[in-house]
Amino acid sequence: MPFAQRLGRTIFHLRPEELLALVFFVPMAYALARMAAASRDVLAGPAAAYPGALARLLTLAGATIFFLWLVRMKPQWKFARDVMPFVFCGNIYVNLHDLIRFYSAPDITTDLYRWDVRLFGFEPTVWAERFAHPFLTDYFTICYWLFYALGPLLGLLLYLKRDRVAFRYTLLSVVLCLYLGYVGYVAWPASAPRLAIPGAYSVALHGSPLLDFTREAIAGVPLTALGAFPSLHCAVALLALMLAWRHLRWFFWVQIPFATGLIVGTIYLRQHWVVDIFAGFVLTFFAFWLGPRLERWWERMALRYAGSVEWAGLKVDTMADAIPAGRMKWGG
């Protein structure tokens, strides 16, 4: 078999989001290895308890080895393979702090502050403190944490509905949005308003003790020091709304109060500049447009090089089998 054919079989035996994870693994593992070999990190405050670079490198390597073993040896573990993209996204996310520091792109925090002031004539997160109230603080905090649930929950509902097309389009669109956002974090490091201009606020945000604690716990993740641009919270919230409107309309209406609260809450909670949100929305529309197109192209390439598409219970040998009448269901 020619080398190009073997390479094509190897690449297109994977799903697109799996290849993306492996591509991210290389610079991430290199950065973690270099950071682990360097002098010990000195992190202040709650972040001092953050696991060291070596421990996180071993975790990342272990997840990657498990994934390769899963693809090779356990094709019947279909659900495990379906959730692995989110495992990779989470694993890469918690290591981005080292990647940002290692590649040391210029910090654009001051530029974001200036752009916000030029757009509005004032700094929006400072202006929003006039609305501070314990109820709003708790509500926006809950919405903010739901970032970790909105996209995956939509995917799970589509999975249980056994709608293969909608599930694949949703999963790939969300993962694309996340990885593009990760690139933004590394290329344009920026701090959140709460860290960049703490002296500008005259009103402290307080709600219930438990939710106050969860907000304070964010300081234990070093990425929050430089992971503001673009706003992936807002990007994924809007993307989940758009995907739900297209694929699961009733869930769109369920999400509306929480997704809206999340977007508004990033300003109220001083987590993002408005420019971060605009940049996140650009990612949203791009991922929403690209996800289905990349999935369909990948299916064609998989049929061409691998001879079939066998993903999470789906097994087809022709494109006619792959997308009958424009819709694809779970294989039996």
Question: What are the roles of these predicted feature ranges?
Answer:
Residues 79-87, 152-188, 196:
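Interfacial segments of alpha-helical transmembrane regions
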Residues 153-160, 234-252, 282-291:
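Membrane-interfacial alpha-helical segments at the cytosolic side of multi-pass membrane proteins
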Residues 51-55, 136-150, 223-243, 278:
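Membrane-interface loop-to-helix entry segments
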Residues 40-41, 192-196, 228, 261-287:
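Interfacial helix-loop-helix junctions of multi-pass membrane proteins
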Residues 26-35, 89-95, 178-186, 259-268:
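Aromatic-anchored segments of alpha-helical transmembrane domains
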